[in-house]
Amino acid sequence: MNLIFLGPPGAGKGTQAKRVSEKYGIPQISTGDMLREAVAKGTELGKKAKEYMDKGELVPDEVVIGIVKERLQQPDCEKGFILDGFPRTLAQAEALDEMLKELNKKIDAVINVVVPEEEVVKRITYRRTCRNCGAVYHLIYAPPKEDNKCDKCGGELYQRDDDKEETVRERYRVYKQNTEPLIDYYRKKGILYDVDGTKDIEGVWKEIEAILEKIKS
């Protein structure tokens, strides 16, 4: 079973992809991890990627696709894989299809975790992180016992720049702009499944599980 997970920042797609990975025994592959691994191993493509990353630039699609291809040829991907955070653009989706064709594979389902902008803003802007130990809290869903104080180490809690409202709205806008064409692309192929990401973790999982069981049978 070869899957792609789409969803805006804060949609909880990483959490769900991890559960799918555990239940079905297929690896969850995040582009970030893959790039870091290739750089650490010093592969040809890893060296190329490092040049761009060191300059703070985006790694070009052909390098990313090459790294994805190397990863998908590893033995743990034989039964399937979950791509998390890739593809991000239509060009990447088309390049991915071409590359999968060469490997005699195809995508079976694209799970699109749908969460409206205001919900994303609420989820992310209420996050607080401990300056000392890095523990993460949520002022609504998982608040600290004492205001502004970490339960674990007593450190001060703060809001990361990434979690500030204008940053979150900008990330959401960029996500929508890049992903809308992707969603159309996979919908036309008949493999896109929308999941209501506003439900609790268990509710979202039940929806995803039902889709995957249907695909498997």
Curated annotation (Swiss-Prot):
Give Gene Ontology CC terms.
Answer: cytoplasm
Ordered alphabetically, the record's keywords are: ATP-binding, Cytoplasm, Kinase, Metal-binding, Nucleotide biosynthesis, Nucleotide-binding, Transferase, Zinc
Its UniProt entry gives the catalysed reaction(s) as: AMP + ATP = 2 ADP
Organism, scientific name: Archaeoglobus fulgidus (strain ATCC 49558 / DSM 4304 / JCM 9628 / NBRC 100126 / VC-16)
- Sorted alphabetically, which Pfam families does this protein's record hold? ADK (PF00406), ADK_lid (PF05191)
- The residues the record assigns to binding AMP are 31, 36, 57-59, 85-88, 92, 160, 171
The record's top EC class is transferase
Q: Which GO terms describe its molecular function?
A: adenylate kinase activity; ATP binding; zinc ion binding
Q: What family is it from? A: Belongs to the adenylate kinase family.
- Domain remark from Swiss-Prot or TrEMBL: Consists of three domains, a large central CORE domain and two small peripheral domains, NMPbind and LID, which undergo movements during catalysis. The LID domain closes over the site of phosphoryl transfer upon ATP binding. Assembling and dissambling the active center during each catalytic cycle provides an effective means to prevent ATP hydrolysis. Some bacteria have evolved a zinc-coordinating structure that stabilizes the LID domain.
Q: Which SUPFAM superfamilies match?
A: P-loop containing nucleoside triphosphate hydrolases
Q: Which residues bind Zn(2+)?
A: 130, 133, 150, 153
In its UniProt entry, what is this protein called? Adenylate kinase
Check the record and name the InterPro entries matching this protein. Answer: Adenyl_kin_sub, Adenylat/UMP-CMP_kin, Adenylat_kinase_CS, Adenylate_kinase_lid-dom, P-loop_NTPase
Region described as NMP: 30-59
Job of this protein: Catalyzes the reversible transfer of the terminal phosphate group between ATP and AMP. Plays an important role in cellular energy homeostasis and in adenine nucleotide metabolism.
Record region (LID): 126-163
Q: Output the NCBIfam families linked to this UniProt entry.
A: adk, PRK00279.1-1, PRK00279.1-2, PRK00279.1-3, PRK00279.2-4, PRK14527.1, PRK14532.1
UniProt binding sites for ATP:
10-15, 127, 136-137, 199
